[in-house]
Every structure is written in structure tokens, then in C-alpha cells.
Amino acid sequence: MECLIIAEDIIQKVKDLNDIVDIVSEKVKLKRTGRNYSGLCPFHHEKTPSFSVSQDKQIYKCFGCGEAGNVITFVMKTKNFSFVEAVKYLADKVNITIDDNKDKYYAKNKEKYDKLYSMNVEAARYFFRNLDSNSKAKKYFLDRGINQKTMRRFGLGYAKDDWRQLLSFMKSKGYTELELIEAGLIVQKNKAVYDRFRNRVIFPVFDYKGKVIGFGGRVLDDSKPKYLNSPETKIFKKGTNLYGLNFAVKNNIGDTIIIVEGYMDCISLHQYGINNVVASLGTALTKDQAKLLKRYASKVVISYDADTAGQAATLRGFDILREAGFDIKIIKIPDGKDPDEFVRKNGKEAFMRLVENAVSIIDYRINRAFENVNLKDSESVIKYVKDISEIIEELDPVEKDVYIKKISDKTGIREQAIYDLISTDIQKSGNNIEKMNKNSNYGQNLYVESAHVKSERYLLRLMIEHKDIRSYIESKISADDLIMESHKKIYNIILNFEDNLSSDLKSKFGFIESRCDDGESSSEIVKIEEQNIMLSENNVKDLVDDFITNIKKFRLEESKKKIMSEIKGLEEKGLFDETIELIKRMEEIQNQLDNL
């Protein structure tokens, strides 16, 4: 968890001494084309170079996928570093020393973070010692095949069935109730304070560096909730960590990671010597987890539970991992077992065979859909073919041929009929707004920005450059009204411009960049800096109003699409009465669109 801010002049010095052409060339083979350099984009698959690097401006831009940024952004995105990590990496290259403890440019709250880590370590030791004194808790792990060595390695423990045991212990170590509340170890309710975890086996949660950042606890009886996790704290953010990654990193995991759902799945596989395993801890893999994973691997094998929730999570996880650029395969475990059960019953070699035979997402979706098909029921077969046609219509011609033959073999429907169905679907979807439009002159895809994205950038550029216009924009639109999360962050940073901040643009953009701690925001601020807006005294407010209208229009159209989808789902189930309120809502949205 980064808690540091580096001064703008240090950041600028790091950028000045690291030529972007040199840094990009470590990853991309560049060729000089006029004043710029070009190569194959590292952020998306392409055969014709659309990635351009400007040595004069010290920025890069891909005309195929829209990625853009400076030398720091490039390091953040290609290495999945945070902003501070990227600056430190580049600083090391040019022998600039940045001292975590003494540098005056860092925020002064490191001591508070260190105390949170110390409290968690102390609590983890306490829980671990408790395990030996409670036979029921220890039996829980032993019954699941977890040996003493693994219990010690993962720091597994037990929280006693007592309201204030941990509280008393931690206070004896010198920690205050307020500090323990901030760490999420105790709860305050109706002026009373008590232990958060009681009568539960405990799983310490580590970050990728091996620091204890939180805990998960499972009940030993039928009480609810079955699992209880630490709340979010300054060092523990849900959806930004992967359980077991610290162990996986230590074991030379290679280029492939296996993702499972829960603590026990991860722990069991590690015990059986399968070390390239992490757990997403819940059914929803996040973009932040995918970014963290990208530092260590380019291939992912998903092994979620076989139940409905697990299958749904597999599909959601696939979309996020695909967006992050992973090569993805999916395991189907026989008999509906989870990874923990399977490896305990069948051993390491059997599980590794499942990994070797993992299938692509297309095969997974086709096979999953086929499970519910009744080949004797014509309607069931037709629905299956239509559903699958939507899945494969975006594949390249060779892949499409392969899957059409598979579907034809499964269903007995002629290949030509399936081709015709896909062609019809593609024609119907031709009216949809596409991000990628075909450039007939060059035979490559060019990225087309949406109107609302451009409008948000223009508004932010105006806010940065013109203080008087900033006030007008603030009165018309807030950060929450913006669509892109990175733009919301930049909007709020602009509102916090310091009074003594220089009025020149370079200082303002430097101030913002030093506070953009993620790749998307860092990339966006470079794009905003590149925007040029022609202004006259007469058209400023009209321009701003037009930009805001574009944003509102997009949000309303997205709401309309969502409601239309809900109406369609209800109608397919025959629930026509339930659609009445939704139809009224859609009419209201349409009226708002008409009045924009």
C-alpha cells in the first residue's frame, strides 16, 4: 500500500533523465519514421504498427487501441507498477536516490502505516498460538488434510470464543482502543468495544510482499456469517490483493498462475507442491487484482468452484483478465468438486492433468451451454445454436470454421445454416456504435474516441488552464457526474490545487501527475495535456454546456440500454406486469434525452 507523494521537481528530473525512446525500446522494437518512432503496440495484438513514440514530446500513443502516456505511464502499464514504484524504478536507472524514510518530499504518515502492519503481525502471532490450545479448531484443519508444516507456513490460527481476549492482549502490548479499531481488529458499538473475530479459525491475509494486512475468519459451528473478513483499512483494500501471491512469487512460478476462489483451495494446492496458485477470495475478480497479477504472469488458468456462482464468477473473471491482456484457460473439475476436494482425493498429478487439459473460454462457454441442451427438443437445440452463434461471431475466420464444425457435429445442424445465422447477426449489429472502425486505406483498426470521453477531457483541460472557467464548470457538474473513474480522480485533484501553486501549466500538470497513483489516471493526464481548445470570449460557456450535454446524453443512453435489457429479460419470462414501471422509467429517460 503506497502512502507516499513525490515532489513534482523530483518527478520532472526523473522524466528528463530517462529518454522515452530508450525505455520503450526495452519492450518494443522501434523504427524511426520521420521525427517519430513506430512499432507494434505492447498493449494490444496487432500485425501492422500503429504505436508511435515522440522523442520531442517524450510521449507515446497507439492509434489502434488509444493507449497514450509518458515514460512513467509506460513503466506503470507494462510492469503493472504503482506511480511511486515506477518513479523509483526510473530513478534507479539514472542514479537518483529517493529515501523512503528521510526524503522531505514524502508524506509524513509512514509511521501510522508501519504501526498498522505491526498490530496485524502481533494479532497473527496471537491467533497462531491459540490454535494449539483448541483441539476443535486444529481438528478443522487436520480433517481437511492440512498438516502442521502448512499451518505454520500460512500462519493459520484461532480466535477464542471470548469478547475481549484479543483486545486485552493487544492493550498489554501498548496499543490503544482507537488504534485497534482503525486496524479492524476490534469493533465499537453502542459505546462498547469487543473483538471482531470470535470462535473462528483464522486465515491471515498477506500482501504480495508478505506483510499481514488483514484476516479472514471461518466459524466452527452453524452461526452466521460463515466467513468474516477484516474491514477496509489504510493497508487493506478489498479487491486489490490476491491470497497466496506472496508464497507463489517466492517459488519461481514461471509464466502461468492458477486462480482459485477460497483460502482452503489455495492452501491445499500449495501443500501438494502446486505453488503457482492464488485465491481471489470471493467470486468477483477485480481489475486491480488482474493488474497486480500481470506483474508476475501472462497466462492464467481459472479453477473456480463448479456451482452456479463459481461458473458465473469464471465468466466475469475472464472478461477482466482478457482486458488486462492475459492468455486464459479454464479448468473443469469432474463431479462438481472444488480444487481442495479434488487434489486431496486424487493428488497432484491428477490436478496437473486438469491444468494441461484446460480449455479456452469459447470451449468453456460452448460446453457449459450444451449441458442444458435436450437434443430431442428442437426448440432447445435451436436456442443453443443461436446463443453460441453470438459467442463465435467475433472470432477470426479460421477459429470460426473450427467452432462451427464442432457445433454442427454436436447438434446435427448443417454448417452452412450456422454460417448464415452468424452473418445475419453481424448485419443486425452493424448499426451499433463501434469503438474500432476499419480504415480501408491501411487495412488496420483505428481507435475512435467516444464523444463523452473527449468532452470530459476538454472540461478538465479548461479547469486546469482557466481558474474562472473552472468555477463555472464546478457549478454545473461534479466529479460524480463524470463517467470515467480516472477523470473523477483528476477532477478532485484539480479542486485541491494549492494556493501557492504556480499559475504556469507545467506546474499544474506536474502537481496532478504526482497524485495520479494508477496507470489509467497517469495516462489520462497526458492525453488531457495534449488537448487543444480554440476559445473566444463569446463561446466559452456554450462550449462547456455542449461538453456537459454530451456526458449527460451518454449516461442517459446507458441507463436506457440497461432498462431495455431488463424489460427484455422479464418479457422472456412472461412477467409482463413487472415491465410497466420500467417502461414508464424508459419514457422519462427518453423525454430527458429529447430535451437536451
Curated annotation (Swiss-Prot):
SUPFAM superfamilies: DNA primase core, Zinc beta-ribbon
UniProt protein name: DNA primase
InterPro entries membership: DNA_helicase_N/primase_C, DNA_primase_core_N_sf, DNA_primase_DnaB-bd, DNA_primase_DnaG, DNA_primase_Znf_CHC2, DnaG_bac, DNAG_N, DnaG_primase
Binding annotation for Mg(2+) 2: 305, 307
Keyword annotations from UniProtKB, A to Z: DNA replication, DNA-binding, DNA-directed RNA polymerase, Magnesium, Metal-binding, Nucleotidyltransferase, Primosome, Transcription, Transferase, Zinc, Zinc-finger
CDD domains per UniProt: TOPRIM_DnaG_primases (cd03364)
Top-level lineage group: Bacteria
Family: Belongs to the DnaG primase family.
GO cellular component, one term: cytoplasm
Source species of the chain: Clostridium acetobutylicum (strain ATCC 824 / DSM 792 / JCM 1419 / IAM 19013 / LMG 5710 / NBRC 13948 / NRRL B-527 / VKM B-1787 / 2291 / W)
Any Pfam family hit: Toprim_2
Organism lineage string: Bacteria, Bacillati, Bacillota, Clostridia, Eubacteriales
Cofactor(s) essential for the protein: Zn(2+); Mg(2+)
Record's subunit section: Monomer. Interacts with DnaB.
Domain Toprim residue range list: 255-336
GO BP term, example: DNA replication, synthesis of primer
Residues binding Mg(2+) 1, per UniProt: 261, 305
Function noted in UniProt: RNA polymerase that catalyzes the synthesis of short RNA molecules used as primers for DNA polymerase during DNA replication.
